[in-house]
């Protein structure tokens, strides 16, 4: 499978075209909209979330609730577009007009300056509109389609926030069902009820100070069969693809799988997961320090991926920058933004991980229809249990 997204933060809509989804997959628009609503929640979101009520429209590839095998077109309209029609118009406008609203002061930590230089743009709005994290809206919609495919095979996904700024949640061993239920009730998507109010207070203080906060999120995938991905070529390793997917999320600066960077300070005997076998489940591991991936392939254990999000670069008390017209120092430009988007980013992380796992399933079990894919998966799972 593959997909492309298009659209700007303040343009009329965000669009995704997905190709390669098997036919006869039941698609629920309500479930896609539920994921979009999850992305809009979270303590620390900005005023724009009071404007946007994201809802998906499916323009192709789904008929009467089922995929047809044709490309699927997803659209999410930007309600805020009504206030930006002149500024974001595709029609020419006069230089110096209000509609131009040119941006010449790049924000530290954003794509503004690098993109302007690369694409020969003197107006950095042409960069910031596309590089905005608003683009993740339609990626969550894409991920919601992937989740519905995975659900057909009993593969489930959950996520949580582990850290916001200096506040680190205490790790808790809970079932995926409990994790999903409890994080949905948390304004910061955190299991630790003691850390939750501290995180919220830190976000409020950052907002008061005109600053922003980052953090760490974790995604867990259960029910994944053994052998997704491959060891034979670098670009087919599933852990590499998952790392790229997480790092593709705006403002993410780090990723780890399983115990990740902790492994650097441990001995091999403390890192590797011992293999066990029984008649009911076949091969398994005593522990899951590898995070469900070894040699670029899934082990059958839960896939565990974490990502680090830096503080959002748009600050209401901006850092110093340089105006590209005068080359004089100025405070960087200000765009409406969140003070902390880590809870929302955990939903985005779930979406991009869902896509990669679903894509790996389609590669392992290539089928034009869901019916054929289900039979292929059934036979493979029976084979792995008897291996």
UniProtKB/Swiss-Prot annotation:
Cofactor(s) listed in the protein's UniProt record: FMNH2
This protein's pathway: Metabolic intermediate biosynthesis; chorismate biosynthesis; chorismate from D-erythrose 4-phosphate and phosphoenolpyruvate: step 7/7
GO biological process, one term: aromatic amino acid family biosynthetic process
Residues noted as binding NADP(+) in the record, renumbered to the chain: 39, 45
Binding site for FMN: 130-132, 250-251, 295, 310-314, 336
Pfam families in UniProt: Chorismate_synt
Keyword flag Lipid biosynthesis: no
GO molecular function per UniProt: chorismate synthase activity; FMN binding
PROSITE patterns: CHORISMATE_SYNTHASE_1 (PS00787), CHORISMATE_SYNTHASE_2 (PS00788), CHORISMATE_SYNTHASE_3 (PS00789)
Keyword field contains Calcium: no
Gene3D superfamilies found in the cross-reference section: Chorismate synthase AroC
Annotated segments matching region Disordered: 92-113
Cofactor note: Reduced FMN (FMNH(2)).
Family from the record: Belongs to the chorismate synthase family.
The protein's role, per its UniProt record: This reaction introduces a second double bond into the aromatic ring system.
Protein name per UniProt: Chorismate synthase
Organism field: Brevibacillus brevis (strain 47 / JCM 6285 / NBRC 100599)
Phylogenetic placement of the source organism: Bacteria, Bacillati, Bacillota, Bacilli, Bacillales
